[in-house]
A protein has these predicted regions:
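Short, Lys/Arg-enriched N-terminal segments with co-localized hydrophobic residues
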Residues: 2-19
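Class I S-adenosyl-L-methionine
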Residues: 55-125
Length: 305
């Protein structure tokens, strides 16, 4: 079931008719499922995983439940990126029925898939037909870009205009994440074993942020309760500093522990009483690096086109 506001989805799905037939394409890092993609009329490439030496694709033969069962059971889980062949095959298929493709992968700072797609789009057979947007976003903010692109295509904007808008708008988003365990940051090399051990002994909860490109450290807290409040406070500060006024959306996002996430959702709603707070799960590729029990709050400026 789609979790975005009915007003936004109505705009995305029904308004206007494009002069060009433009396809919108993304990957499952956006949190968009195959069912949601079909409902929206877009294309979503599943991200590949290797679990104990076996290959899987997110939302194809790898469910959230199966993924967390393996991850929490100690399986060796690795993320990967779609092959050039898979991307090229999908582009070729789409271009048989469309004039252009807007391709919105996850941030180039978090995966090589964006750079690979950008190099492919520069080849003669795709130049001027495939527009790869490095939106420097992931999860709900990447999904917001997809919905903006779809709405613009349905309003009649050209592929170049959509690409330019998304590129210029990429920094109008903010995400803060806190993790329940440091184990997965250590496994992924984002935290040294010594630092992870010390932080664990001190019961420190790190807060991470995505402000364009990479996942970076923002701060630390001694309790999850304080970390939750710090994230909300900083999102509010970012909204104020960037002058968004009331022209923004807020989201509460989580990995695995829905009960804790629903509790945090109420806290986010209290902090933003005039907003319809979006509630969503983190994509598996993000969860793989930060682990189950993670909570995040995000905000992004509403589309203006």
């Amino acid at each position: 079931m789609l979790i975005y506001s009915s007003k936004l989805l109505k705009l995305s799905l029904t308004e206007g008719g494009p002069c060009m037939k433009i396809a919108i394409m993304t990957d499952s890092n956006s949190g968009i499922t195959q069912a949601e993609a079909k409902e929206l009329g877009i294309y979503c490439i599943p991200m590949p995983f290797t679990i104990d030496g076996k290959e899987f694709e997110e939302d194809i033969n790898l469910t959230q439940e199966h993924f967390y069962e393996k991850l929490m059971g100690g399986a060796e889980v690795f993320t990967s990126q779609p092959t050039i062949g898979i991307i090229a095959k999908k582009w070729d298929e789409i271009l048989k029925t469309h004039d252009a493709i807007i391709h919105i992968p996850m941030s180039s700072g978090l995966s090589g898939s964006c750079q690979t797609a950008m190099m492919m789009a520069d080849e003669d057979q795709y130049k001027g037909k495939v527009f790869v947007v490095d939106s420097q976003r992931i999860s709900v903010t990447q999904k917001a870009d997809v919905l903006d692109a779809l709405a613009m295509a349905n309003k009649g904007y050209s592929a170049q205009e959509i690409y330019d808008y998304l590129t210029n708008n990429k920094m109008n988003a903010t995400i803060y994440v806190t993790v329940d365990t440091l184990e997965y940051l250590k496994k992924g090399g984002r935290l040294s074993p010594a630092a992870a051990t010390l932080a664990g002994l001190l019961k420190i909860k790190p807060i991470l942020t995505i402000q364009g490109e990479k996942l970076d450290k923002y701060g630390t807290s001694r309790t999850m309760k304080k970390a939750r409040k710090m994230m909300i406070d900083q999102v509010k500060q970012d909204i104020s500093d960037r002058g968004w006024g009331d022209d923004y959306e807020v989201a509460c996002v989580y990995s695995y522990d829905k009960e804790a996430a629903l509790d945090y959702l109420e806290q986010v709603k209290e902090a933003f009483p005039d907003k319809e707070v979006i509630f969503d799960r983190l994509s598996l590729s993000v969860a793989c690096h930060i682990g189950p029990g993670s909570l995040a709050v995000a905000a992004y400026k509403k589309g203006s086109y």
